A protein has these predicted regions:
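Basic, amphipathic alpha-helix used for nucleic-acid engagement in HTH/winged-helix/SANT-Myb modules
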Residues: 1-22
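Conserved N-terminal entry element of GNAT/NAT acetyltransferase domains
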Residues: 8-10, 26, 79, 86-121
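Acyl-donor binding region in acyl/amide transferases
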Residues: 11, 22-26, 31, 35, ...
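N-terminal accessory alpha/beta regions
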Residues: 64-72
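A short, conserved structural fragment
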Residues: 71-79, 261
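Short, Lys/Arg-rich nucleic-acid/phosphate-binding segment
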Residues: 80-83, 265-266
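Long C-terminal interaction/binding lobes of large macromolecular proteins
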Residues: 292-296
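Short, cationic low-complexity segments
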Residues: 303-315
Length: 315
């Protein structure tokens, strides 16, 4: 069966792929079909030198691109072959994440807060995963794409953790956000990396400190741009989050001056098929990190990823 002619170029995750590179993808997908999708993606990442600033291959992003090209009929991929037990990775729980004595008061009493970047297979990383798995209603999931995690501590409480956060790549499509920005499909494909999604935010259940959540969000808005640039080589322009409106009202985001944009349409986070999948509708909030953010997102060029040394990417 003949495959349709490839486009002149495709832009994905901030990188433009020429027709010759797309031809290479088609050729490798045909030649190594017996290896499976993951190995095809890894091979292409090596050939195209598609890497993170830390040097790690962008395997997930490459596989996602291949699957989108396959959906358009531009190349063929082997069927997915499940390996081992399916489902989320299990996190072994220990006493480190067990309930602790209650902390009360106001956020001002716990200043200065410390937002500690969690990287690699450190003790902080294991603690972060445990706390999220045990105490967050969504539990722990391996994030995809770019990500940054924080543990929040206070000088007053020493090593005791007050909160955990995770920031990840933005949702591919979000009607309320995309209308607010006013960008085209091509502009979104080019500039989406400049948006960072707050995919996990956990105030630990024994921490009952008034105003703490909004205070942490304000600290993040100041610190995250530099931390993200240090790891990925560019500064984000906009923060976003999705709040389960059946559980939460988004009060802390409102208190931290995030902008409410409405609700999602009940589609999955990486919606590719323009249809509802049964996902609960979420409240959409955004927080600009610069002036004229909508215009800047519409006009931005794909980010230039730094070759500087960065923390090991754990995702």
């Amino acid at each position: 069966m003949n495959q349709p002619e490839l486009p002149e170029s495709v832009t994905f995750c901030g990188r433009r792929f020429s027709r010759s590179e797309l031809e290479l993808m088609r050729q490798i997908a045909d030649q190594f079909a017996g290896l499976g999708r993951t190995e095809i993606a890894r091979t292409l990442c090596e050939l195209l030198e598609w890497k993170r600033p830390s040097g790690g291959l962008k395997n997930y992003e490459c596989r996602q691109l291949l699957e989108r090209l396959a959906e358009q009929g531009w190349l063929r991929l082997p069927e997915v072959r499940p390996l081992g037990p399916r489902g989320p990775r299990r996190v072994r729980l220990s006493a480190a994440s067990a309930e602790q004595p209650e902390l009360t008061g106001t956020a001002g009493q716990y200043e200065p807060l410390r937002l500690i970047v969690v990287a690699g297979a450190s003790a902080d990383s294991r603690l972060w995963m445990e706390l999220i798995e045990r105490h967050h209603y969504l539990g722990y999931r391996v994030p995809v794409g770019a990500q940054l995690r924080y543990l929040v501590r206070s000088q007053r409480t020493g090593e005791r953790v007050l909160a955990c956060l995770q920031w990840t790549s933005a949702a591919w499509k979000m009607a309320a956000r995309d209308r607010w920005i006013g960008w085209t499909h091509e502009q979104r494909a080019r500039s989406l990396p400049y948006i960072v999604n707050n995919s996990r935010f956990l105030i630990l259940p024994w921490v009952r400190i008034q105003g703490l959540a909004s205070k942490i969000l304000a600290h993040c808005a100041r610190q995250l741009p530099e931390d993200w640039q240090r790891r990925y080589g560019y500064r984000p322009l906009l923060l976003e989050t999705l709040v389960d409106g059946q559980r939460f009202a988004g009060t802390c985001y409102r208190a931290a001056n995030w902008i409410p944009l409405g609700q999602t349409q009940g589609r999955g986070r990486m919606d590719r098929y323009h249809q509802a999948d049964g996902s609960a509708r979420k409240l959409v909030f955004v927080y600009p990190l610069c002036r004229h953010v909508q215009q800047r997102l519409r006009e931005a060029q794909p980010p230039c990823f730094s070759e500087a040394e960065a923390d090991t990417d754990w995702a």
